[in-house]
UniProtKB/Swiss-Prot annotation:
It holds the Pfam family ACAS_N. Residues 1-37 form a transit peptide. GO terms for molecular function: acetate-CoA ligase activity; AMP binding; ATP binding; propionate-CoA ligase activity. This is Acetyl-coenzyme A synthetase 2-like, mitochondrial. The lineage of its organism: Eukaryota, Metazoa, Chordata, Craniata, Vertebrata. Interacts with SIRT3. It comes from Homo sapiens. It catalyses: acetate + ATP + CoA = acetyl-CoA + AMP + diphosphate; propanoate + ATP + CoA = propanoyl-CoA + AMP + diphosphate.
Length: 689
C-alpha cells in the first residue's frame, strides 16, 4: 500500500514540477530572505516537519525516501526502466563494509533502455544533435540511426574478441560515434572506460593498464577550437606500454591519414561489414556498466565503478526532475563525455528519457565568445548545463556577446563541476537567462553518479538562492560532521559533508581495490559516506558547498590530486622536493601552485621551471600545469617530516598573519624565508606588467 501511495505522490510531484521555469524572487548574495520552502530530510530544519504533512509535497516525498527507501525506489525502478527479469530485493547496503546493492535479482540491458524502447515508439525522433567544432555544421542523429550504429559497433567489438565483462577504453572527443561506442559496450555486456581526450599518453596508458583493457577505440584526429588534436599519435605512444591491448579501432574525424600498425583496425570499414542488429546481453543489476577514473588525494587515479540499473535510474530521474525536462525539449549539456557529467547528462540520463541531447565538440570562445549563445539560438536549446569556469571566462567578454543572440528557448540554466561564485551566478541568471530562467547550481561527484543537491526538485514557487546548491535530491540524506566525528545539528553551521544513507546511483567500488574504496569514503566517519567536501547549512535547511577538505583541487571543473602533480614533478632529476597546493583563481575557480626545491647543481632555475611545466603537461594534461612554480630553498615541515601545506596556502592567499598553530613546525624561521621569496616573485611580476 505504501509503495502505491508513494508512486502516486511521485506522480503528483512530477506534475507539479511543470512550469517551474519562472525564477522566484531572489535575495542578493550574502543576504538572507524569507523562507517559503523547507529542504532536506526530516530533521534538517524546523520547517520540514510542517511541510512534510502535505502529501505529495517535496518535503513529504523527501522524508519518505529517507524513511522508506524500498517503498520509494522500488516502484520508480519498476515503472521507469525496461526489465528482462524483475528484481526481488530493492536494496541491500552496508556503509561499514562499503557494500552497495540495488534492485537485486533484476536483469536488463542499458542500451535497450536508451535506444530500443524509443525506436519502437518513435524511430525518427532525434536522439543527438552533434554541434561540431565549426558552427552551423551540426548533424542530427535519430534514435533509429543511433541504434543501428550502436549494433554495428557492438558486432565489430564481438568480432574482435570482446566478450561480456571485458574492458574497453574509449579515447574520443564528443561525437555520436563515441556515444555509440559507450552504448555498444553496454549492449554486449562489456565495461567501458572513457578517457578524456586531452590526457597525455602516460596518463592514458596508466588507465588502460589499471583497467586491463582489451580494446581501445579512438579517432585518427580530433578537432577542438579550430585546432587539430593528434589522438592516434597519443594512443600509439600509450599502447606501447599496454600489454593487454589486442586491438585499436580507429575511426576518422578528419581526412588526414595516420600510421596504421599491427594492432590497428579501420573502424568504419569493419562496421560497414556488420549487421545493424545485435541481440542485447541481459545484465544483472549489479554487473559493471562502466568505470571512470577520478583523482584521489594520494596515488594513482581511482577507477570508480558504476553498475547497471541503479545508475541508469538515478541519471534518468535527476535529468528529468532537476532540469524540468519535458518531451520535445532540446537538452544542452556542454560537458565532455570523458567526465561523469557527460556520462550522466549527455548520454545515459537524456537517452533513457528519450530526450534530444546536444553533443558540443568545440569551446566556449570558438570562433568567438558568443559560441554558446549562438548555439542556443540555432538549436533552440531549452536546458543549458555548463561549468562556472566557462561562465567566469565569458563574463569578462561582456554582455554584448550574449544579447546578440535569441535565448528565448531557454527555461533552465545549470551549473556543474565546482561551486559557482555570486558574480558568475548573477550574470548567468540576469544576462543569459534574462532574469526569467531557473538557475540550478548542482552539487555531485563522479562517485555519486548523479546530482545530489540542487535547487530542484522543489515546491512550485519555492525560492532559489544565488550560489547555493540548496536542496537534497530524493533519497539523499546530508549530514554535517565536526572534527571529532560528531553530527553537527541545527542551522547556520558548517562541517564535513557526509551522506547517511545509500542511493541507487552511487559508486560500488574502486576497480581492483575495494579496501581503498572503503578507506576513502567510509572510514573517516564510520556509518556515513564522506564526500570530501565541506558545506554550510542555513536557517532554512539549505546547503552551500564550501569546497574540498582534502588534497584535491578543482581546476576548471577537473578534479586533480595534488599528489599527481607532485609525482610528475618528482621525475625531474633537479627537483628533490615539491609541494603543490590549490588556490583561488578568477577564471578556473582553483589553480595549482607548486613550491619546489632545486638542487644547487641544477643551473638556471628558470629553465627547470619551464621543463617542469612541459613534464606535467606530458605526464598528466595541459590543464594540470601549475600556474605558478616558486623555487624555495626548503619546505616547511613538521618534526616528523610532513610538509605543512596549510602554511603554504596561507602565504599565497595573503593570510600569513594568521598562520594558526605552528608548534609542530621544525624551524619557524622558514615562514619568513618563503614569504620573502614569494614577495620578490610578486614584485617581479608587477614590474613586468
Amino acid at each position: 500500500m505504501a509503495a502505491r501511495t508513494l508512486g502516486r505522490g511521485v506522480g503528483r510531484l512530477l506534475g507539479s514540477l511543470r512550469g517551474l521555469s519562472g525564477q522566484p524572487a531572489r535575495p542578493p548574495c550574502g543576504v538572507s530572505a524569507p523562507r517559503r520552502a523547507a529542504s532536506g530530510p526530516s530533521g534538517s530544519a524546523p520547517a520540514v516537519a510542517a511541510a512534510a504533512a502535505q502529501p505529495g509535497s517535496y518535503p513529504a516525498l523527501s522524508a519518505q525516501a529517507a524513511r522508506e527507501p524500498a517503498a520509494f525506489w522500488g516502484p520508480l525502478a519498476r515503472d521507469t526502466l525496461v526489465w528482462d527479469t524483475p528484481y526481488h530485493t530493492v536494496w541491500d547496503c552496508d556503509f561499514s563494509t562499503g557494500k552497495i546493492g540495488w534492485f537485486l535479482g533484476g536483469q536488463l540491458n542499458v542500451s535497450v533502455n536508451c535506444l530500443d524502447q524509443h525506436v519502437r515508439k518513435s524511430p525518427e525522433s532525434v536522439a543527438l544533435i552533434w554541434e561540431r567544432d565549426e558552427p552551423g555544421t551540426e548533424v542530427r542523429i535519430t534514435y533509429r540511426e543511433l541504434l543501428e550504429t550502436t549494433c554495428r559497433l557492438a558486432n565489430t567489438l564481438k568480432r574482435h574478441g570482446v566478450h561480456r565483462g571485458d574492458r574497453v577504453a574509449i579515447y574520443m572527443p564528443v561525437s555520436p560515434l563515441a556515444v555509440a561506442a559507450m552504448l555498444a559496450c553496454a549492449r554486449i555486456g562489456a565495461v567501458h572506460t572513457v578517457i578524456f581526450a586531452g590526457f597525455s599518453a602516460e596518463s592514458l596508458a596508466g588507465r588502460i593498464n589499471d583497467a586491463k583493457c582489451k580494446v581501445v577505440i579512438t579517432f585518427n584526429q580530433g578537432l577542438r577550437g579550430g585546432r587539430v588534436v593528434e589522438l592516434k599519435k597519443i594512443v600509439d605512444e600509450a599502447v606501447k606500454h599496454c600489454p593487454t591491448v589486442q586491438h585499436v579501432l580507429v575511426a576518422h574525424r578528419t581526412d588526414n591519414k595516420v600510421h596504421m600498425g599491427d594492432l590497428d583496425v579501420p573502424l568504419e570499414q569493419e562496421m560497414a561489414k556488420e549487421d545493424p542488429v545485435c541481440a542485447p546481453e541481459s545484465m544483472g543489476s549489479e554487473d559493471m556498466l562502466f568505470m571512470l577514473y577520478t583523482s584521489g588525494s594520494t596515488g594513482m587515479p581511482k577507477g570508480i565503478v558504476h553498475t547497471q540499473a541503479g545508475y541508469l535510474l538515478y541519471a534518468a530521474l535527476t535529468h528529468k526532475l532537476v532540469f524540468d525536462h519535458q518531451p520535445g525539449d532540446i537538452f544542452g549539456c556542454v560537458a565532455d563525455i570523458g567526465w561523469i557529467t557527460g556520462h550522466s547528462y549527455v548520454v545515459y540520463g537524456p537517452l533513457c528519457n528519450g530526450a534530444t541531447s546536444v553533443l558540443f565538440e568545440s569551446t566556449p570562445v570558438y570562433p568567438n565568445a558568443g559560441r554558446y549563445w549562438e548555439t542556443v539560438e540555432r538549436l533552440k536549446i531549452n536546458q543549458f548545463y555548463g561549468a562556472p569556469t566557462a561562465v567566469r571566462l565569458l563574463l569578462k567578454y561582456g554582455d554584448a556577446w550574449v544579447k546578440k543572440y535569441d535565448r528565448s528557448s531557454l527555461r533552465t540554466l545549470g551549473s556543474v563541476g565546482e561551486p559557482i561564485n555570486c558574480e558568475a551566478w548573477e550574470w548567468l541568471h540576469r544576462v543569459v537567462g534574462d532574469s526569467r530562467c531557473t538557475l540550478v547550481d548542482t552539487w555531485w561527484q563522479t562517485e555519486t553518479g548523479g546530482i545530489c543537491i540542487a535547487p530542484r526538485p522543489s515546491e512550485e514557487g519555492a525560492e532559489i538562492l544565488p550560489a547555493m546548491a540548496m536542496r537534497p535530491f530524493f533519497g539523499i540524506v546530508p549530514v554535517l560532521m565536526d572534527e571529532k566525528g560528531s553530527v553537527v545539528e541545527g542551522s547556520n553551521v558548517s562541517g564535513a559533508l557526509c551522506i547517511s544513507q545509500a542511493w541507487p546511483g552511487m559508486a560500488r567500488t574502486i576497480y581492483g581495490d575495494h579496501q581503498r574504496f572503503v578507506d576513502a569514503y567510509f572510514k573517516a566517519y564510520p556509518g556515513y559516506y564522506f564526500t570530501g567536501d565541506g558545506a554550510y547549512r542555513t536557517e532554512g535547511g539549505y546547503y552551500q558547498i564550501t569546497g574540498r577538505m582534502d588534497d584535491v583541487i578543482n581546476i576548471s571543473g577537473h578534479r586533480l590530486g595534488t599528489a599527481e602533480i607532485e609525482d610528475a614533478i618528482a621525475d625531474h632529476p633537479a627537483v628533490p622536493e615539491s609541494a603543490v597546493i590549490g588556490y583561488p583563481h578568477d577564471i578556473k575557480g582553483e589553480a595549482a601552485f607548486a613550491f619546489i626545491v632545486v638542487k644547487d647543481s641544477a643551473g638556471d632555475s628558470d629553465v627547470v621551471v619551464q621543463e617542469l611545466k612541459s613534464m606535467v603537461a606530458t605526464k598528466i594534461a595541459k590543464y594540470a600545469v601549475p600556474d605558478e612554480i616558486l623555487v624555495v630553498k626548503r619546505l616547511p615541515k613538521t618534526r616528523s617530516g610532513k610538509v605543512m601545506r596549510r602554511l603554504l596556502r596561507k602565504i599565497i592567499t595573503s593570510e600569513a598573519q594568521e598562520l594558526g598553530d605552528t608548534t609542530t613546525l621544525e624551524d619557524p624561521s622558514i615562514i619568513a624565508e618563503i614569504l620573502s621569496v614569494y614577495q620578490k616573485c610578486k614584485d617581479k611580476q608587477a614590474a613586468a606588467k
